[in-house]
């Protein structure tokens, strides 16, 4: 969600990310640390059930809009390599998984979406706020709705050559054999002249 970039407080990489492979060469102890991530059950079905564990690495990222702000980078067991790029930014105030991770590792929780347009000075969140609202604490996005902020931030990232608009579909394979039994029928016409038509 590009609208929540001002609330980013960490970057998380999949243990299978190519940057992690490069780090293993320079940091021999990293392999031992990676074993602690308990990667046995990290598939899409189990990812919400497992304990979120991370390894902080000695690199930092520069915030795309705040050049003087650096963001710590972790290797985390809840980031999957086969979805997107295998790297995500964490916005703890607006994603429960990120919120839990930030609490565990004592990271900043910066509220950037609120029901009201007013700026919030103190963070009193007890859980992530995941509803829509207005952008706050977000520089040039302040006062915009979530949808407006998404559009503005994507355009700014494209203008700065830091990103581009993309859509990732999460479609799963599914069989049609039970479609008639479980759901809407699949229209098939049996024509004596032309054969089966779908």
Model-derived features: positions:
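NTP-handling and nucleic-acid-processing catalytic cores
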Residues: 2-109, 113-114
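Residue patterns forming the tRNA-binding/recognition surfaces of aminoacyl-tRNA synthetases
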Residues: 87-198
